[in-house]
Amino acid sequence: DALPELVLLGAERNIDTFDVRFNAQGPVNLVASTLSFSDKSVVTRQSRVRDLTLVGEVPPLAGDEDVGTERLRPGAGEGVELQHRVDREARRRSRAFTATGSVRLGCYAGVLRPFRRVTVKLGTTPTSGSYLVERVVHRLTRSDYAQEFTLVTDAVSETAAGSGLIPAGLF
């Protein structure tokens, strides 16, 4: 069961507030190394942004030349298989946009739940598209039901990306 769309503009508006922030330090390609005790060799694993499955349509950065490479700090998460650790951290850091906001009282028919995908319509802006619900707070009073949310995405909308609305090198 898909969540209803969140809409900022027009007659179908159901978003009260919506604030999008761009994470300029992510996404990054990640590299991690560890010592293999069996043969005393160095094992290195990497995860590239271009290999990740996107939440939305188009990656916010054009290619590998726009993405930096970072080495993970040794020791963090050592109990986890190295490739899994690198992939997990790359996925976490790939969230280029974080949005916070709230739905209009009585206007949104759905119940937002974490880890669900929702489509957000913000006109023709590049930040329209698919988001993942990261966090939601439900407030129920005698007269109102309110939802405040945090959404994340690692992509921009295809229509905005192809329209020239995104200045080159900005996203």
Q: What kind of region is each of these model predictions?
A:
Residues 1-12, 19-21:
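Charged- and aromatic-enriched interaction segments used to assemble
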Residues 14-171:
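An acidic/polar, Gly/Ser/Thr-rich interaction patch typically located in mid-to-C-terminal regions
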